Every structure is written in C-alpha cells, then in structure tokens.
Regions:
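Sec-dependent signal peptide recognition
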Residues: 2-8
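Repetitive helical segments and hydrophobic/amphipathic motifs
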Residues: 11-12
C-alpha cells in the first residue's frame, strides 16, 4: 500500500475505511464458512467427464488424489469456503472467478492458478470457472517454479524475455494458460465478483482489502524461495507443488457438476 503524505488525519481516515472494508470481507468469509460446513459433502466427487491429461501428469494426479484425505480438517474448512463460492456461482449460472494472490506473483500464486484450472478440467466442471493470479507487485514467473510444474507433467512453452508469458497446458487440445507476473488488479484479471485467495501471509497482511473481491480466503503456503540455491531446492519446490495441487484438487472435488 502507498503511504499517505497528507498527514495523520488522512492516514487515519484511510485506515478506518480499509478496516471497514476488511471487516466486510472477513464477515463474508465467516458466513460462507458456516455454509460450507453445512452444504459441502465430506466425500469427494468422482470426475464425471475428465479431460485426458498428458500421461506423466495423469500419473502425478493419481498420487495427488490419493493424498487428499491427509489434508488437516482446519485446512479443509478454509478450502471449503472456496468450493462453496464456486458451487454457488455455478448454480446461479454466473462465472466463478478465482484470483490467487501472493507478493510477487512468481511462485505460489501461479502454481495455485494452474492447478485449480487443471483440477476443474479433471472433474469436468471447468465451464464457467476462471482462474487468475497476481501479486502486490510484478516480477516474473520464477524459473524454479516453472521447472516444478514441468516435472509434474505440464507442457510449458517459454517465449523468453524478462517477464516471459509462458504457455502452460495439461492436455492436447485444451486451452493453454498464459502465465506471467502481474499485479492482482491487472486488466486481464477479474475486477469484481471474485474470490481473493491469499496464498502467502505477507500479501494477506500487507494488503488487507482487495477491491472488487466478494470473498477473501487466506490459505498461505510456505515460500519455496527459502530453498533457492541449496541442495534442497528441487525437493522443496516439488513438495510445495504437490501440496498446492492436492489442495486445489480437494476444492474442485467438492463441487458438484
């Protein structure tokens, strides 16, 4: 957030307005959490008309689905809020827009966007579900995170440049996802009636109000960046990729087609 240079009274006013908006988003989140507990089934649904994924990705997804039961209940409660948002939008024939947000839009938010779209296709519910990602600032989709999704089985085309617009696909003939770093309010992202999914605690703390969001759900992940340049780099990125994949698949498994 930009610091006010107009004095303490203006700063206080801005803070008050932000707090009120933040309260509204939190209250909306709490209401949806109660509804999620009542309306979302515990048993994940089976894919009805899943897309034929690339072979290596399909094998990877089998292990992802097998891991869903191990997600802690507290975490599932948060994920169900997102599932209910998607379910409600689909039942109303409205687009279900999911925007995944972290500080630099370089690792966790991209993985979340990609895996959410892939999970929706796997369960045959992708129509009307739109996934986006953004940061509080723009950098680039980190090459280490790109390498992790490639190891999972995605096909990725890199056009080059300082902030490449990667083309990511999960199946032949499926729409390619264009992934590049941008701010969460980029013109290409949804600007209203979306769920703001906060994938890092720093962005959740520093940006307490997301304009246009009808729901805000924090599901922070540990930043794999902490392993950059170490012997644990590949293992850490793969672990985070698998965790995010498992939770995105859990979300979509809770949505009835």
């Amino acid at each position: 957030m930009k610091k006010s240079i107009l004095g303490l009274s203006v700063a206080a006013l801005l803070f008050t307005g932000c707090s009120e908006n933040q309260k509204k988003q939190k209250e909306s989140s709490q209401v949806d959490n109660v509804a999620a507990e009542a309306d979302i089934p515990e048993t994940p649904s089976k894919p009805e008309e899943s897309k034929t994924m690339y072979p290596d990705l399909s094998t990877y997804i089998e292990s992802v689905v097998a891991d869903m039961d191990a997600i802690p209940k507290e975490r599932k409660d948060q994920l169900k809020k997102i599932a209910l948002f998607v379910q409600t939008k689909k039942q109303s024939n409205e687009p279900a827009n999911l925007t995944f947000i972290c500080t630099h839009n370089s690792r966790r938010s991209h993985m979340s966007q990609i895996w959410a779209a892939t999970a929706a296709a796997y369960y045959g519910i992708e129509d009307g579900i739109n996934t986006y990602s953004g940061g509080t600032e723009a950098t680039a989709f980190n090459p280490r995170a790109v390498a992790a999704i490639k190891r999972a089985g995605f096909k990725v085309k890199n056009p080059g440049g300082e902030n490449p617009r990667y083309k990511v696909s999960y199946a032949e003939g499926a729409p390619q996802m264009e992934c590049f770093s941008k701010k969460y309010d980029d013109p290409g992202n949804a600007n209203e009636n979306f769920v703001a999914v906060m994938t890092c605690s720093e962005a959740d703390k520093n940006c307490p109000f997301i304009p246009g969001a009808s729901l805000r759900v924090p599901i922070p992940y540990v930043d794999p960046k902490e392993s950059d340049g170490t012997d644990q780099e590949t293992a850490t990125y793969d672990e985070r990729c698998k965790q995010i994949a498992t939770e995105m698949f859990y979300i979509m498994s809770q949505v009835k087609a």
